[in-house]
Curated annotation (Swiss-Prot):
Membrane-spanning intervals of the chain: 28-48
Gene designation: atpF
GO terms assigned for molecular function: proton-transporting ATP synthase activity, rotational mechanism; proton-transporting ATPase activity, rotational mechanism
Compartments, record wording: Cell membrane
Protein name, entry field: ATP synthase subunit b
Membrane topology: Single-pass membrane protein
Species of origin: Malacoplasma penetrans (strain HF-2)
Length: 195
């Protein structure tokens, strides 16, 4: 209980320490002249703050705003310029791709033409070589035919000479013909080996 009494005593002592309303007003505004002096000094202080602090701050803020606006306009201009340059570079890239495609296409066409020319020249040379080979073969065949005819005519003359020089009976006729055939076969084999 004693604690409750102590609390009440402290509350009562606080109330007595707080001055009443009239005392507060008298302490703040002891008289009207002091109040007027305070108001005038407050107005002077406000004017001084406006003159010395607000106006330079306001002009600094305006200058800073103008600077920011100028930089934003420059950034927008630079962005427009970069977009324009990007568009131009894309167009140039597309033109380069088209030019490269044309160059490749022309190169392929030129390669195809060159290939056809080379094939035509090769076919022409092959045809020429073939005709030369064919003519050489024909020439060799003609030579062989001439040799064969000469051999046959020589053989025929020899045979005729043998027949005319000898008395021919049937058995000797067969023997002479066999000798001539064997001789002719040997000569043909030797001439084919020479080739």
């Amino acid at each position: 209980m004693e604690t409750i009494n102590n609390v009440f005593d402290s509350v009562i002592s606080l109330q007595s320490a707080i001055p009443d309303n009239s005392q507060i007003i008298n302490q703040i505004f002891p008289n009207v002249y002091v109040l007027i002096a305070h108001v005038i000094s407050l107005i002077f202080l406000l004017l001084l703050v406006i003159r010395l602090a607000w106006k330079p701050t306001k002009s600094y803020i305006e200058a800073r705003t103008k600077e920011i606006q100028r930089k934003m306009e420059a950034a927008e201009k630079a962005q427009l310029e970069s977009e324009k340059n990007l568009h131009i570079s894309r167009i140039k890239l597309l033109e380069s791709k088209n030019t490269a495609a044309e160059i490749i296409e022309n190169a392929e066409l030129d390669a195809e033409k060159t290939k056809k020319k080379i094939e035509a020249v090769a076919l022409n040379k092959a045809s020429q070589i073939e005709s030369e080979g064919y003519s050489k073969i024909k020439k060799q065949e003609l030579e062989l035919e001439k040799r064969k005819n000469l051999e046959v005519s020589k053989l025929a003359l020899e045979t005729a000479g043998i027949f005319l020089s000898k008395k021919i009976d049937e058995e000797e006729n067969k023997k002479i013909i066999d000798d001539i055939v064997n001789d002719l076969t040997a000569k043909l084999e030797s001439s084919s080996k020479e080739k």
